[in-house]
């Protein structure tokens, strides 16, 4: 890894993202002093970290890496208490104040009931939470975490990130961590460093980094689509007999009936009502069209990634006759129509979709209501 030149102010979270093997762990280990640097300097509060004594550095910097810790004959409380040893004397004897801090830290990570349990017998996720308690006990200025959410379920992933944000907000702690979950990185980070190959590819705020085209390039994403609105990825539709398709397939992508890629189902949706149907049809490999969807509708964002064609309308405009006619033509070529809207969800702006539903019923098409 070369040409890394970044600075991070106190009380901020920097997240490293990038493909596997890109160098995220190498950067964290270099900052922590666990890898000898070929060149360059790491400064902490204006001081070269190599000039700071080990015990003082342990008070100011806490590190949790991905390797599993397998200590012998240590309870969860013992592991958390390890964070207090930079503050003890040569014999490492904990004071009552130290023990109080250990109990508080275990309570924060919801592991106080496991204080006396053998660390090796608790689950990987619970071990990760105990290691976070150790970090809290250590009271550092800088926390380094390598994939801290790897072994956690979604509830405890969120809990861990909330704890980190609280430490940042209340104690002005600085956090540098690596994450694979882009949707979490987008929400928790103040700054993001993108690492790929030998270089730090880009550095900036989440708003600057999490762009559809850039994330696709960073991860060489050719088997799915990244949505900057949702902050998540969608699985690319299998090519199969229907061939390849790129996102943003508006009405111009619709083919004539009977040709490969022709939608078999027309979905009338809006306001998020079509999401589960879009994903179900994609899982089943059924090509479908969606419309009429306003370009600021959340269903439009998903449909443009999963549907074979989308009939759009401008944001905040009533569905016009041109969009209605295009949708009607495509719908008539489909053997099946799914309407995801309740009767009361039709209004002035999307009255064209009510007309589409009536035309489908009048024409005797196979109409299914999903509400």
State where each predicted segment sits.
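Conserved catalytic motifs of ABC-family nucleotide-binding domains
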Residues: 139
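ABC ATPase nucleotide-binding domains
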Residues: 220-318, 339, 347, 366-371
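Helix-to-loop junction immediately C-terminal to a conserved catalytic motif
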Residues: 32
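Conserved ABC ATPase "signature" region
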Residues: 81, 96-114
């Amino acid at each position: 890894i070369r040409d890394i030149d970044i600075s991070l102010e106190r009380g901020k979270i920097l997240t490293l993202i990038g493909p596997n093997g890109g160098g995220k762990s190498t950067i964290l280990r270099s900052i922590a002093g666990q890898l000898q640097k070929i060149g360059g300097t790491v400064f902490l509060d204006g001081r070269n970290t190599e000039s700071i004594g080990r015990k003082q550095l342990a008070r100011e910097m806490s590190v949790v890496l991905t390797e599993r810790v397998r200590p012998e004959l240590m309870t969860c409380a013992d592991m958390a208490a390890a964070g207090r040893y930079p503050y003890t004397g040569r014999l490492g004897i904990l004071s009552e104040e130290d023990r109080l801090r250990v109990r508080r830290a275990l309570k924060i990570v919801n592991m106080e009931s496991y204080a006396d349990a053998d660390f090796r017998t608790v689950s990987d996720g619970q071990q990760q939470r105990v290691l976070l308690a150790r970090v809290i006990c250590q009271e550092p200025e800088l926390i380094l975490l390598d994939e801290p959410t790897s072994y956690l379920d979604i509830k405890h992933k969120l809990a861990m990130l909330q704890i980190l944000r609280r430490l940042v907000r209340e104690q002005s702690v600085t956090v540098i961590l690596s994450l694979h979950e882009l949707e979490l990185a987008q929400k928790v980070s103040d700054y993001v460093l993108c690492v790929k190959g030998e270089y730090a590819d880009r550095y900036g705020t989440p708003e600057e980094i999490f762009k559809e085209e850039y994330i696709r390039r960073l991860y060489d994403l050719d088997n799915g689509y990244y949505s900057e609105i949702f902050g998540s990825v969608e699985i690319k539709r299998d090519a199969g007999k229907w061939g390849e398709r790129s996102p943003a397939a508006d009405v111009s992508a619709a083919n004539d009936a009977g040709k490969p890629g022709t939608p078999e189902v027309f979905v009338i949706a809006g306001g998020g009502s079509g999401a589960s149907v879009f994903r179900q049809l994609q899982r089943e490999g059924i090509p479908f069209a969606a419309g009429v969807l306003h370009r600021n509708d959340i269903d439009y964002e998903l449909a443009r990634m999963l549907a074979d064609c989308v009939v759009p309308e401008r944001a905040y405009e009533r569905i016009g006759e041109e969009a209605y006619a295009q949708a009607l033509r495509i719908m008539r070529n489909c053997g099946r129509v799914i309407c995801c809207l309740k009767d009361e969800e039709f209004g002035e702006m999307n009255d064209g979709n009510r007309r589409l539903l009536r035309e489908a019923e009048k024409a005797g098409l196979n109409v299914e209501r999903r509400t």
